[in-house]
Amino acid sequence: LKGFFHYMCTQVNKLTANPTENISLGTPQKALPKYLTENEAVELLKNIQSDFYERDYCIIVFFLNCGMRLAELITINLGDFKDDTIKITGKGNKERLVYLNTACQAALEHYLPARAALNNLRDKEALFVSKKTGRRLTARRVEQIVANCLKSAGLDNMGYSPHKLRHTAATLMYQGGVDMLAIKEILGHENVSTTQIYTHINQQQLKQAVEASPLADTGYIAPQSKAMTDSKQDLSLIHI
């Protein structure tokens, strides 16, 4: 609308003044990212059903614990692991180290033997490979795997995706007391301002927690009687 009135004033000279010139458009509020609650994340892990369980379980565990992007997960190679860390190649080919917690290490220990047992393994370096072709998983295939796992857990109608699992990892870390700068490094964000969105999520939860109090709707309770109020005033004078 502002552009239309600007055009009418400057190009066709139909107006002498732009009535929208001093109207501020404001800054649109960013939508809070969707994420699984801790209970939903546990249910997801407990209800994975797959003909290659070890691989799919490991994928979900990595998303939920490392907060990596889909593109980062599918490019992981066996040579990217060193001790209890994994080298992740992020946007702009920038590398970062992420530590593997106990859950990630356990998932990896169960998956690697199952991967090695494949008879048709072709991409020798790729961590996550197809059981059918032996080649590195594509982004689309991982999306399907995540969708199937969510469906098995009854979470398929909530708009979740691999990127939502990344949001889940960051949110649960923040709720667990992890420093924002540490989360920034784990996620591979350029600026901490990008990571700040997770503080808004927590503030919203704090508000909801207070409003959930059974006393939240009691409102203002007036004195039961004027006599009771007067007696309290008299007692207060005694102590002066």
Model-predicted segments: where are they?
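Conserved catalytic core of the tyrosine transesterase superfamily
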Residues: 1-237
